[in-house]
């Protein structure tokens, strides 16, 4: 992944004007004006679709568990795009408010953990699980809480460790999903996970690839959209309509 990032180094090309130089591992990259605008737009665009999509799941809910899961997932999905947009807007237009920007950056990273947990909630709550696998319903929230505590104490200090935490948080609950008796939607989940993994190349490429963080945002949106489709189709769509969709 990181070898590919080194190959895609645009610092000595005509596109270098769209990005700033790389910074040491312990410092935060400062985007150009172009990149700031792209960072805001690439997540702001998805706020309304995420609200509409979450509302759709709520209205398709047939029981309390489906309603609760729709709320949890919807809050995680909308929260991700809203918090990211607010942080990048403040970072761009109000960068002199250092403490506010720093706090929002921490919240932005914390929300990712809860977004991952919320993305698994419908699968863990609405699908049949084994006696041991059912513990993952609450374990994902413990993992999200641990990740939040880590960000609070070690924000931007050990970036590779932070990235590893996101990867573990993203893949560990998937082991339970794969073991479910009903595996409908697995391919969509794997496709969404692939979008996130490919996006990590750009997540670690600020200063090498112009608009790297904005491209990462797009991969996040594609991954989230794929996972939303799987949740809508296999967990909320009435069985009669599922048959029509699959044809």
From Swiss-Prot:
Segments on the Cytoplasmic face: 1-39, 88-103, 155-159, 204-210
Keywords: Golgi apparatus, Membrane, Receptor, Transmembrane, Transmembrane helix
A UniProt-annotated Pfam family: HlyIII
Cell location: Golgi apparatus membrane
Positions in the Lumenal compartment: 61-66, 125-133, 181-182, 232-247
Keyword Membrane: yes
GO cellular component: Golgi membrane; perinuclear region of cytoplasm
Main location: Golgi
GO MF: pore-forming activity; protein kinase activity
InterPro entries per the UniProt record, alphabetical: AdipoR/HlyIII-related, Hy-lIII
One biological process term in Gene Ontology: positive regulation of neuron differentiation
Covalent S-S links between cysteines: none
Membrane-spanning ranges: 40-60, 67-87, 104-124, 134-154, 160-180, 183-203, 211-231
Listed name of the protein: Monocyte to macrophage differentiation factor 2
Originating species: Mus musculus (Mouse)
Name of the gene this protein is made from: Mmd2
